[in-house]
Amino acid sequence: HSQGMFTNDFSKYLEEEHAKEFVEWLKNGKS
């Protein structure tokens, strides 16, 4: 169970990081 929870938290972390990068990319692309 702890392995699954770790994977779930990690995937959430990756999604958040990817979202930040995407926002920065959009800002740089639009300006």
UniProtKB/Swiss-Prot annotation:
InterPro entries: Glucagon_GIP_secretin_VIP. It is found in: Secreted. GO terms for cellular component: extracellular region. PROSITE patterns: GLUCAGON. Induction: Produced in the A cells of the islets of Langerhans in response to a drop in blood sugar concentration. Pfam families: Hormone_2. GO terms for molecular function: hormone activity. The keyword Secreted applies. Keywords: Hormone, Secreted. Belongs to the glucagon family. Glucagon plays a key role in glucose metabolism and homeostasis. Regulates blood glucose by increasing gluconeogenesis and decreasing glycolysis. This is Glucagon-3.
